[in-house]
Amino acid sequence: MDPNTVSSFQDILMRMSKMQLGSSSEDLNGMITQFESLKLYRDSLGEAVMRMGDLHSLQNRNGKWREQLGQKFEEIRWLIEEVRHKLKITENSFEQITFMQALQLLFEVEQEIRTFSFQLI
């Protein structure tokens, strides 16, 4: 796992938690929760790849890991669309920078998860 990605996650989550988007704060909290969930999933896949022999363990723990992987990609696409939408409607430069960084992070994480999953297949 790239240490820069880990610190990027922490930075984005901290920045998002400080934002006040009025009535959409519930949406923002949902995005933060999704980001945290995505980080945990990416980390667990990365650990499985590091152990390489852990594919069988991963399959035993979750026989539907491919289905779960597909769901994670759907979550990433949903988050990308949400972040793009927030980026379009916000006029605050701090929020714009945060959402641009979040978007870049999502693209990086999507690529990492794809790489991990191909190594596990």
Swiss-Prot record:
Chain location of the short sequence motif Nuclear export signal per the record: 12-21, 85-94
High-level lineage: Viruses, Riboviria, Orthornavirae, Negarnaviricota, Polyploviricotina
Family in the record: Belongs to the influenza viruses NEP family.
Protein name per Swiss-Prot or TrEMBL: Nuclear export protein
Taxonomic source organism: Influenza A virus (strain A/Malaysia:Malaya/302/1954 H1N1)
The UniProt record lists the keyword Hydrolase: no
Major localisation: virion
Entry's localization field: Virion; Host nucleus
UniProt KW Ribosomal protein keyword: no
Further remarks about this protein from its record: Average number present in a viral particle is estimated to be 130-200 molecules.
Record keywords, A-Z: Host nucleus, Host-virus interaction, Transport, Virion
Gene Ontology biological process terms from the UniProt entry: exit of virus from host cell nucleus through nuclear pore
Top-level division of the source organism's lineage: Viruses
InterPro entries in the cross-refs: Flu_NS2
Database matches in SUPFAM superfamilies: Nonstructural protein ns2, Nep, M1-binding domain
Subunit structure: Interacts with protein M1. May interact with host nucleoporin RAB/HRB and exportin XPO1/CRM1.
Segments forming a coiled coil: none
